[in-house]
Amino acid sequence: MAHQWVLNAPEPPSMLRQVVDNVKETLLPHPNPNTFSYLRNQPFSKRAFALLQNLFPILASLQNYNAQKLKCDLMAGLTLAIFAIPQCMGNATLARLSPEYGLYTGIVPPLIYAMLASSREIVIGPGSVDSLLLSSMIQTLKVPIHDSSTYIQLVFTVTFFAGIFQVAFGLFRFGFLVEHLSQATIVGFLAAAAVGIGLQQLKGLFGIDNFNNKTDLFSVVKSLWTSFKNQSAWHPYNLIIGFSFLCFILFTRFLGKRNKKLMWLSHVAPLLSVIGSSAIAYKINFNELQVKDYKVAVLGPIKGGSLNPSSLHQLTFDSQVVGHLIRIGLTIAIISLTGSIAVGRSFASLKGHSIDPNREVVSLGIMNIVGSLTSCYIASGSLSRTAVNYNAGSETMVSIIVMALTVLMSLKFLTGLLYFTPKAILAAIILSAVPGLIDLNKAREIWKVDKMDFLACTGAFLGVLFASVEIGLAIGCRSRYHLRR
């Protein structure tokens, strides 16, 4: 009988069947497995709405929507946009892109994510770590980057591959790999990335035009020293403006932590800094006839006035670089997912609900694929913007939609006003976010709990700081693996 039972056992499902089942389970989740059987006997409109609710979870949250929730979401979305617009532009410059690409990335990915994701809090946009990782890894490619258009093609293609990997992770249930990525490695990586981001922003803070593209400590210090020796390479006005408004932003943040009633001031401080510094730069540069004679380095003309342009034709699959771009896309996909899921879980727990990791991963992947086709670069969950959204009283993902539409309006009507925005102020805004990436308490906890993990953390930190982002990650992951053997 036992042999007969084995012989009559059903064949395992095919790979295609497993993929189809995974897609259904990820995109059409439902707590009651009998629900869809029940809906078969219901009118078509009811079945269609149930399907749409599962495909687009935001519809379920809108069933009990009211005027009070709309008011909260409108205020949170506008507050979020005021905070996000300068940050999006600053992160774009960190990725060595024009500021408008940061604004593009603050429109399409958040709108798509708001419709598809199970999270009610995560705010999507360009992140500082992703921007640094993207620019530093593309700069290591041994292919000629003739001009900015070639670089942009590489950026969009990497974003496309990152989205493909993220969707695959979600559909094939590989989300657990991201969740179990060593926390020690991530802590060390983020701390070193924060130092790298800070060092790179010295370029904008001092108004230096010619600066080393590498992110390791030795290269950046050497570039700074060369610029300082050449007095004409920088102007003290840039440092004065950048440092003054950096202190202002940090001071408002301090006030917000001390007094919750003043939290709003820290949210609007970046935009106030952009407005104030732009007025100062306009006054200082007013009498100069040519941009090269400006004493304060400014952004100059920013392309705007329209929706995100299509970038499908800018994807490149050249056999010389496509393998390298796939590798970069995989690395960035994992790093951005790790941060996004951590942010989502943290804020979901504060509101007493959970998120579906695999659905989040698929949603992030879809938005990055679509983003790569609409002039966006890699987008992920932002801790600082999610915190602003939470503290501003957001009720649903409608606040994210309000933010994205506000960014769109600013791109369409206000880009001309950003001409005199100092580069130093964008550097100051990014620098103000750097301390949040360095978690000394977590590093201390890792040291107390597991010395081997702390060595992996240290290896990742030193590797990123003195070599490159990619080498640092490899050292952190491999050292932890070998130390555990």
Swiss-Prot record:
Q: Which GO terms describe its biological process?
A: nodulation
Instruction: List the membrane topology term(s).
Output: Multi-pass membrane protein
Q: Which GO terms describe its cellular component?
A: plasma membrane
The main place the protein resides is membrane
Q: What is a GO molecular function of this protein?
A: secondary active sulfate transmembrane transporter activity
Matches recorded under Pfam families: Sulfate_transp (PF00916)
TM segment ranges: 74-94, 97-117, 121-141, 152-172, 186-206, 232-252, 262-282, 321-341, 361-381, 400-420, 421-441, 455-475
The protein here is known as Early nodulin-70
- Give the organism, scientific name: Glycine max
